[in-house]
Amino acid sequence: MSVVFESARPIADGVHWLGGCLSAFGHGEEVHYHVNAYLVIGRRRTALIDTGDPAHRDLVLAQLDEALAGRALDYLVPTHPEIPHAGNLPALLERYPDALVVGETRDYHLHFPEHAHRLRPRAAGESIDLGGRELVLLPAHIRDLENTTWAWDSGAGVLFVSDGFSFIHDVPGPDDEDEPVHRPGQCRLLSGEMPEPPSVAQAAYGTGRALYWTRFVDVSEAFGAIERVLDAHPTTLIGPAHGNVIDDVDGMLRTSLAAHRAVYAGGGLGQ
């Protein structure tokens, strides 16, 4: 797969969308899928949510240099220990020797024993003070690993949801791929900037493959919890790890719930 290079995109005051797209060929055409990371800049501290894919290591480092504009990176907040979410931790910790890994870090000492002294466990409900804004750690109500964490930025009202709220556009994924995909030219677009809003079928296609457990679980209770999260944490944007940043929060919530229900009913698997 080739890497599609894109510059970091500011999506809100103090929030930058980093990472890149991987490309593959499926069903006779090129398709891309996002592997996202997000930088939140406060008055005193900065935090990076997820690390991007190791294939994007040099890109993420360059994007950080640009977005930080000479400031240090203080906190790394991987949402869970999978390669697209934590794979660049060694490179980032080397580049930023004073940065700390903060969040649900219960098994990171096993993956990165040489960096165990830089782990700072924080539980859901705790906050990271960045100066003028806080990054609030939250339970992940849609997840593929038990120790997944979501986060909410109080400064701009951005909810970072890891593998939640992923969706595809226009085309099914590359053969044997599980990631939400889109066509070239649609990288780094907000969901509202896409030619068409995501459909239930597009959301269901990615959901049923990337989160296999959704085929067997009625998520109505989880979405009730998500609505309570949104009530308590006013949200203007949702930043998934895979897929476009969502600027129609209410619409995507309805679409995603319908997609999960379709997968559970066996009607959203693209088969």
Language model regions located:
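Active-site neighborhood of phospho(di)ester-bond hydrolases with catalytic His/Asp-centered motifs
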Residues: I49-T51, L73-P81, L100-T105, L159-D163, ...
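Helix-coil boundary/capping segments in enzymes
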Residues: Y33-V35, L61-A69, A210-E221
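Active-site metal-binding motif and surrounding structural segment of the metallo-beta-lactamase
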Residues: A55-V101
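Short, surface-exposed connector motifs at secondary-structure boundaries
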Residues: R43-T46, A69-D74, P234-T235
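Active-site environment of divalent metal-dependent phosphoester hydrolases
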Residues: P81-G87, Y108-H111, E126, D144-E146, ...
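Conserved beta-strand hairpin/beta-sheet module of binuclear metal-dependent hydrolase folds
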Residues: E6-L64, T149-D153, G157-V161
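Cap/insert and terminal regions of metallo-dependent hydrolase folds
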Residues: I168-Q271
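Metallo-beta-lactamase
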Residues: P10, Y96-T148, V217, E221-G224
